[in-house]
């Protein structure tokens, strides 16, 4: 998949960071703080979830790149509990500290256009590796997504395989969400979850992040899977 992004090279002291954002904002995708509420809900339409899955895939193979997905200003949903947050994906090797993010974020100016490519087969292979290890080690993996929230931003720190596995979960929501009965009626439908990939937390109120699908209105423009997108209405007869 080809994905248009903006690339920034801000500096903090002697360090230069590489930050990418989606070229067009995910206007119909929202996320709330999963640590404050103990339950996060990532809710999006087909376009938003598809591009977000590609961004997870890109993050998986970009160890020194910070992926920033602005979501706080997305259009509010009917059911969107809690405080809206942005999303940042990064490997530990990117050297990002959440406390340093507000200062770094103010320097994201004059980004240059860039087209990146994601490889679905490679992503699926590394996702399968993560799940195989998870099964082999009795639900104990060596890579997890470590969540943190600071300055109204959810940070997910992780490695290649767990980001790839998360990408497949988001992609599942994008692909199968439109088939849900609630989605066809215009409501949100819970389809997948990022919770299995979060760092183990044995407290009874461990944070969870679920993934939902909701087609944005007007619903008459939404084309269900299996129906040609180019289908046109019959033209009115001329007088």
Label every model-predicted segment.
Residues 1-239:
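Positively charged, low-complexity terminal tracts
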């Amino acid at each position: 998949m080809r994905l248009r992004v903006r690339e920034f090279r801000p500096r903090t002291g002697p360090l230069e960071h590489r930050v990418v954002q989606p070229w067009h904002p995910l206007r119909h995708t929202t996320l709330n703080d999963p640590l404050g509420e103990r339950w996060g809900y990532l809710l999006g339409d087909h376009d938003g979830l598809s591009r977000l899955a590609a961004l997870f895939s890109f993050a998986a193979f970009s160890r020194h790149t910070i992926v920033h997905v602005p979501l706080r200003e997305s259009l509010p949903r009917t059911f969107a509990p809690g405080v809206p947050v942005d999303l940042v994906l990064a490997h530990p090797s990117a050297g990002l500290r959440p406390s340093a993010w507000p200062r770094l974020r103010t320097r994201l100016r004059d980004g240059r256009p860039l087209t990146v490519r994601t490889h679905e087969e490679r992503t699926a292979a590394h996702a399968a590796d993560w799940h195989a290890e998870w099964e082999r080690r009795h639900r104990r993996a060596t890579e997890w997504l470590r969540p943190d929230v600071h300055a109204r931003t959810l940070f997910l720190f992780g490695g290649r395989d767990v980001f790839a596995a998360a990408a497949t979960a988001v992609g599942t929501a994008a692909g199968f969400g439109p088939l849900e009965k609630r989605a066809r009626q215009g409501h949100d439908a819970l389809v997948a979850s990022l919770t299995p990939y979060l760092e183990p937390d044995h407290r009874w109120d461990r944070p969870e992040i679920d993934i939902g699908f909701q087609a944005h209105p007007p619903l008459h423009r939404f084309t269900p899977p299996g129906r040609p997108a180019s289908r046109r209405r019959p033209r009115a007869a001329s007088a």
